[in-house]
Amino acid sequence: AYADAEALLINNDFDGAIEEFKKISGYKDADERALEAYYQKADSLQSAGNDKAAAIAFGQSDGYKDSRERSITLWNTIAEHPTLAAGRRHTVGIRSDGTVAAVGGNNDGQCETSAFSDIIAVAAGNFHTVGLRADGTVVSCGKTTNKQCDVSSWENIVSIAASGNHTVGLKIDGTVLATGSNVCGQLNVSSWSDIVAISSNISHTVGLTASGKVVAVGSNNDEQLQVSVWENIIAIAAGTRHTVGLKADGTVVAVGNNADGQCDVSDWTDIVAIAAGTNFTVGLKSDGTVIATSVPK
């Protein structure tokens, strides 16, 4: 089995080699050779220009050689790092020195960010604030009723999302962590893999894979999770009861509640970025103009 695994690696069948080495974990240096296979796979993917998949593969190399450094370098070019975020009644922003300013409602301590440092991204839930540090750890403050602030043990995080009463973190290896309220199943992300972007709202969580597919968990009362047929997606956004995806060709797809026309995006073109709110969707066009679905007064 060991010889078979080595032969697969020599022939650049990286996935096959990884699988075979894992089958004989503990034998000789099989575990280290599996990491070498991950590393060579990542190097090959990066050489081919597939930076998203390469970032994940380097992350799966578990610190082997310079894999963590190479993964972080790639993630810094592909991961979203919002410097501003708004919760239900508060707003937070990253200062140039990596500290965080916050204003607004503070009944639950969601604005008590004075201890935050080395922050590269922020996210805000209804009554809590989350910060991603440059070293991949996460800090938080605010309401803890649903354990939405239980992130102190998280590490190797490259992107964060927060909404309602839950918090989501994307790891360097493309897996996802989540904590907080799970009343609708919005935390059920443990089986996700190859994720390159995350988005969440009150009752659902969405993930974008390196292959351009989309996964979603949580409430499906308005069919906001019906994203399995989407392809060639490069960005995602979760509204309160709808989900939006930006395609590689600049068009946009949306599913979920459409009572206010928030999913009426089929005629949008030349879009380079998207956002979703309670009952509306916004798109940034390549010429710098902004388009939005109508919201009744």
Over which residues does each language-model region extend?
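Conserved core positions of repeat-based scaffolds
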Residues: 90-93, 102, 128-131, 140, ...
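Alpha-helical tetratricopeptide repeat
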Residues: 1-9, 32-46
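Beta-strand-rich domains and repeat architectures in extracellular enzymes and scaffolds
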Residues: 81-93
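Short glycine/serine- and acidic-residue-enriched loop/turn motifs that recur at repeat junctions
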Residues: 89, 104-115, 127, 142-153, ...
